[in-house]
Amino acid sequence: MEMELEPELEEELGVSLDELRKWIEEQVDSSEAVQKRKADLEQLQEWVEQREKEVADIDALCSNASESVVQCEALVKEVYSNMGLVYRESSSDDEGGKANPSEVIEIDDDDDDDVIAVGCLVPPKKSLTQAKDPALKEASAALQRTSQQVQNLAQTVNRTAQSGVTTPVKTGGPPGQGPLAVPAVFMSSAPRNTPTQPNPNIKQDSIKINMTLLGKKRTKTWHRGTLVAIKQVGNNLKYKVRFENKGKSLLSGNHVAFEYHPTLERLFVGARVVARYKDGNQVWLYAGVVAEMPNSKNRMRFLIFFDDGYASYVGLPELYPICRPLKKTWEDIEDASCRDFIEEYITSYPNRPMVLLKPGQIIKTEWEGTWWKSRVEEVDGSLVKMLFLDDKRSEWIYRGSTRLEPMFNLKMNTANSQEKKMAGQQRQRPNMGALRTKGPVVQYTSDNSAAASTGGGAATPGTPTRPVAPQPAGPPQPSRTESPSFKSQMAKKSTGQLALQPRQGMPSDLQPKPIINALQTNTSRLFLLQSGPVHTLTPITPAPQTVQTAISTYTNERVPQEPSYQAPNDRLFYLTHNCSPECLKRIRPTRPNLHRGRNPLLTPLLYEFRRMTGRRRLNRKMSFHVIYKSPCGLSLRNMTEIQRYLFQTQCDFIFLEMFCLDPYVLVDRRFQPQRPFYFIRDITSGREDIPLSCVNEIDNTPPPSVAYSKERIPEDGVYINTSADFLVGCDCTDGCRDKSKCSCHQLTLQATGCTPGGQINPNAGYHYKRLDECLPTGIYECNKRCRCNMQMCTNRLVQHGLQVRLQLFKTQNKGWGIRCLDDIAKGSFVCIYAGKILTDDFADKEGLEMGDEYFANLDHIESVENFKEGYESEAHCSDSEGSGVDMSRVKLPASSRHGKSNKMEERNSSTTGKSQDDSSEESDDEKDDDSNEDDSDSSDDTFVKDTYYTTSSVWRSYTTRRQAKGLKEESQDSKDGMSVSAGEDRKPPHMPEETGKSKVASWLTNQSSTSANQSVKVEGGIKTEKKDVMTLSDSDDVQTISSGSDDNKEREKKTQAVVKRQVAVKSTRGIALKSHSMMVKSGGGGAGGGGSGPSHGHGGGGGDNGPKNTRLFFDGEESCYIIDAKLEGNLGRYLNHSCSPNLFVQNVFVDTHDLRFPWVAFFASKRIRAGTELTWDYNYEVGSVEGKELLCCCGSTECRGRLLQIIKTEWEGTWW
């Protein structure tokens, strides 16, 4: 039929079927829907091809990743074996593959010893979108597993050794799925036990006959040998070793070592090992003690203290474990000085005082009993490379060695302080001068593991941390808890009441009132502010209608915004004229405090002065210079011209301290707090001339309730005579610009004659209303008896009160602090320290009852007298023309150890005869061989304090072995130098010339003549010998000293009553004296040109010939007064501590010239940027407060780590 219809259709339609089919296809192709569908299909095809290519790439990546993981595993195994770690392989099934994946990774931060919790995104078990291609799905799953395994491997490798056994994060997928099921990696390290004790779970390796060991020879070096026999000698086993280089020895278990390298699990601080020491091309094996475990700071090396005094870093392949070490490993060290040091080091670990040094610093270093000028070449972990400038010889020294001058000073100062405490001459309070010298400081470091075990980084002393999130519904809780024993050792600073309480001294209408309780779930940051000077900013929720109304009314109110200063654009021209008051007549204000509350450095600009900064390029260096232009067009290029202009125009509303020529101090840089939770416009309630605002950007905790007072308040028993009849006044009419004619300036200048050298400084005092550095002898300002103009006088600064704009703010981890709102120029006056003035006895009682965290010592008299004493006491480290100072006659005062034999005798006896330990060498043919070896390789005097400082013993860290022969030859001279008897004449020999070296030698001779057995006078004129024997009572509060005779029983009772106080007081002296005061005799003998008096009040009048303490002239007073700002004071109480402070303390006499009652003022020691916290150095003396320990977390690069440290003292072989 079709064949029949085709001709009919073709005839009827007039077209053939092929043509019709072709036409239909053309019409379909021309349709938009069909074309769109076709394009989609083409694009889909391209996507499929691209996906196939990606799958191929992923397969290649997976293959490469699998190979990389295998290579990484091999490298990790090699690293583990080199480091002594145990590498174990286990699949996810062995470790519980069905366990939930971990969501938190603990990272041990080596920099600040904090444990940070980092949230880890766990991969989902199932993909959100199912892939259509099975190959693509499998490749994606394999890639996901591989990336997770690589992450686990990186996490395991980066974990430090102290973090214990590391368990990798489990993947979300089922265990063992896919071709890349790589076993997990585990790091097994020493458990977190006591860092100075061995792991009790590890058994000792057995010692068998014919095994290869290392044995100790008579030359103190260790050599390889074979164990030939084990003998029972008494209750101990002896091991007979035949050395490879001929010879036999019968040795004890602590004098033989295994030949293999130990694992990390077997090592700890204090472990006895044999290590290789390299000196050029020579290599020896010596016994030593592990002082540091590997960590990132020492580049994964072990610090070894060798028995002969060396200190060196070695790797694990260079260590060999001692077979049977003693329980107290330091008892195996023959040298007594080194043994004592190691014992003290291990017992006090991980607290290690070390000198903070930087390359290029110049310090004094001891070598062969003489102090030499040396330069820091390189610092490597706990070691420092010192270059002796005289002979260009370099040497590596442990940074905690007393061969370094700062450490020597610290040890001597601690010993002297303990002696004075025992003798009742010094109260147990720290000396906390406000400024330390710029030289190296002693830093207290802690081991990472020990720090981690305490729960993270410690907060700054005296300030418990607060939660970051606001909690107005209840009292905030500390975010970190501390044990009671830890709290009892901390001198905590008060961070305020937990709840809002009425503020003392404030009217009831100014009390901060919480308006509405905040909900913790509220994420919006809306604030409701109370009108008035005091505001409580509280996040609120837009719930009730009444609250909505309040929000709409007060939402736009924030912390007051200060209008910005706009410099005028018009040019200012100068016409020649003589400046007079008419130049400022146009701008002279009707009231002098028109711009009070603004930045004082901006005030001249507000009165139409111009401050312009010019620059010039000289020798490719850009320099800047600030020029002021007066309203009359006169250019003022320096402070002299500015001062002259102010006096010519009689300007009494703009003052000299309001001008600054430092181009880096910006006068219009304002600091604005970031959306605080709590804000107070002025916490002083108008008592200060400048408002002191308060903000809390952390939570809504208010500041502590303290009665504000900008003046000092004498308490009962304190009388300050401020009568003008007892003041010295001047008659200046030139604003006291001429210091030679001003009586008050002359008081300041003449006082500088009390400094070392006795020379008067003609430039002392204020320099254009600024003080660049501390003046230890104090500044005498003009007073009410002077006839000079109070506003124009250049010698009136502190008495004008607060001028800079400051703000009280809540810090993250230091409680409340003070920061500046504007830039502060160097030398500018900031504020004073005010509070109640207490007597010493009353301060002791109140400090024990209420706390001593806000005590400050008015010790100006002691500061100046100690400063004068320090001239001779620190002469041995002065930069004189002599290359060094002989310390062969210096002796540690009041040493608690007796009967110690001479070190050279010990050295000779240890090298010439048989060893005195339990090791004995047989008389075999090895004697001839041993006798040819260097017998001088005996113990040098190292690491430790010593009773006498001979040529061979000065608390040294280590000495070079090449010095042994020289020391041995000088041994007889050292013995002669130490044989000074107590009955000899104590006067120094006559010196023909008083050169730098002769003065030092004279002083050292005086020191050596004061032996441990001193003659003291008793009733009846009979002299008895006093033996210094320290007796420690069972109580932690009392530490006494007994003379060993019945004659001093009464004195012992007095001592117990004095030294039991444990009050920490800040010192208000402006400088930190070098720790050499212990070198000055504290007794009554006043021979030679050395000390000028005792360093504290109780020391005065100790002998008939000694100079009398100045304080004794004030009705026999013996102790200084205390400023207590705990309950009543000014903003100075909030200034925190820093080891790199930006403020220094200066004693200023304003209303009285009584040396006991200076004003305590703070000045800027450097340029301070707006928004920077203001800090000063409390300068606590380590070990000065018994039973107290304060950690420092100031964050400075020069942080010393400790403010107060419990110091251990050796007595009868035990550390207390």
Curated annotation (Swiss-Prot):
Chief location: nucleus
Residues holding Zn(2+) 3: C736, C782, C788, C793
Biased composition, class Gly residues, residue ranges: 1082-1105
EC category name: transferase
Coiled-coil boundaries: 38-61
Chain segments carrying region Disordered: 417-513, 892-944, 961-1057, 1081-1108
Chain residues that bind Zn(2+) 2: C730, C744, C782, C786
Domain SET stretches: 804-1179
Positions bound to Zn(2+) 1: C730, C732, C736, C742
Keyword Nucleotide-binding: no
Protein name as catalogued: Histone-lysine N-methyltransferase SETDB1-B
Species of the source: Danio rerio
Annotated gene: setdb1b
